[in-house]
Structures are given as structure tokens and as C-alpha cells.
């Protein structure tokens, strides 16, 4: 899980979802997991 100020899609499978007011990137590749912190 990377914590970044700007979250971006890295590949075609990446999806940006808002969970409890936190932007997250959900992907089949675990290396692409990010959240905004």
C-alpha cells in the first residue's frame, strides 16, 4: 500500500474508489494499491 498525495491509475485494471472519504486505488496487481493520505 503506497500512501500518496496524488493517486493515479497505473494500469487498465486500476480503479479509483472513495471509501469513508479516503481515495483508494484498487487493482488486481497488489503493487498498484494506493491511498491518499
Swiss-Prot record:
The keyword Oxidoreductase does not apply. Pfam families: Ribosomal_L36. It is found in: Plastid, Chloroplast. Disulfide bonds: none annotated. GO terms for molecular function: structural constituent of ribosome. GO terms for biological process: translation. Keywords: Chloroplast, Plastid, Ribonucleoprotein, Ribosomal protein. GO terms for cellular component: chloroplast; ribonucleoprotein complex; ribosome. Its main location: plastid. It comes from the Eukaryota. NCBIfam families: rpmJ_bact. Belongs to the bacterial ribosomal protein bL36 family. This is Large ribosomal subunit protein bL36c. It comes from Cyanidioschyzon merolae (strain NIES-3377 / 10D).
Amino acid at each position: 500500500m503506497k500512501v500518496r498525495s496524488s493517486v493515479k491509475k497505473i494500469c487498465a485494471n486500476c480503479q479509483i474508489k472513495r471509501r469513508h472519504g479516503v481515495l483508494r486505488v484498487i487493482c488486481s496487481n497488489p503493487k498498484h494499491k494506493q491511498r491518499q493520505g
